[in-house]
């Protein structure tokens, strides 16, 4: 399904990283991101400066500023690398949409919690609008992914608003996870379950409790 809603508004920021074209530049760029990932294991995003990164990576400050005009560009580059490396999230094969949604959210939560640096950038205070916009776009992508999974096997009620509502559903889940992370420094089992309950309750308001399975073409041919 395509998303009929208008594109997300872009904030005014002039802080995109400068992506290197040459091999040695790409290697240095990756070294800096690896060093940032290491710093985030024991520091908060607000405690890391470009000079800290220069020292940790053993790279001259001029090279750091060449790639990253400021801190926002730095964190945006690491978040983009994380998003680019995420494996696909599936929804399983349960005969009911609630279990498939739970499976999808379980997989997603485990992926996002596999890295301390990702949790700090995703669930903690966003280090700038560039990262925030990447997260908004990713929630939109994930919402469409879950929608496509369910729409493939279930007869959803007709609505042009499904992309928007699934984006809201993913925002609900991440909001609960973020609250847990802010309070405990991790996402505990209680809030994992609460996120699933909240998303299912939200979607159930539009779906109802049961969705009929979609009849595939080969199955329809057998019925003729």
Describe the predicted segments one by one.
Residues 10-23, 30-31:
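N-terminal, Lys/Arg-enriched amphipathic/low-complexity engagement segments
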Residues 25-36, 53, 78-86:
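Generic hydrophobic, amphipathic alpha-helix propensity
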Residues 91-94, 121-130:
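Short linear capping/connector segments at secondary-structure termini
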Residues 102-106, 110-113, 129-155, 163-167, ...:
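Amphipathic alpha-helical packing segments from all-alpha helical-bundle domains
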Residues 35, 39-73, 77:
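Helix-turn-helix
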Residues 77, 90-114:
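Hydrophobic alpha-helical connector segments
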Residues 40, 75-82, 138, 142:
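Alpha-helical DNA-contacting segments of helix-turn-helix folds
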Residues 1-13, 144, 148-152, 166-167, ...:
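C-terminal peripheral helix-coil segments that are non-catalytic and often amphipathic
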């Amino acid at each position: 399904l395509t998303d009929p809603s208008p594109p997300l508004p872009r904030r005014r920021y002039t802080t995109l990283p400068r992506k290197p074209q040459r091999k040695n530049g790409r290697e240095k760029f990756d070294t800096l991101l690896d060093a940032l990932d290491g710093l985030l294991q024991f520091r908060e995003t607000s405690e890391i400066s470009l000079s800290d990164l220069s020292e940790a990576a053993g790279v001259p400050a001029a090279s750091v500023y060449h790639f990253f005009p400021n801190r926002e560009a730095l964190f945006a580059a690491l978040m983009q690398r994380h998003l680019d490396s995420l494996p696909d999230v599936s929804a399983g094969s349960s005969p009911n949409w609630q279990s498939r949604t739970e499976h999808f959210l379980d997989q997603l939560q485990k992926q996002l919690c596999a890295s301390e640096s990702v949790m700090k950038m995703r669930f903690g205070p966003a280090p700038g609008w560039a990262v925030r916009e990447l997260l908004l776009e990713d929630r939109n992508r994930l919402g469409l992914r879950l929608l496509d999974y369910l729409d493939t096997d279930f007869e959803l009620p007709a609505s042009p608003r499904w992309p928007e509502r699934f984006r809201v559903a993913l925002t609900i889940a991440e909001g609960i996870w973020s609250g847990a992370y802010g309070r405990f420094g991790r996402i505990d089992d209680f809030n994992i379950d609460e996120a699933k309950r909240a998303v299912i309750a939200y979607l159930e308001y539009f779906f109802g409790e049961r969705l009929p399975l979609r009849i595939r073409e080969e199955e329809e041919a057998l019925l003729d």
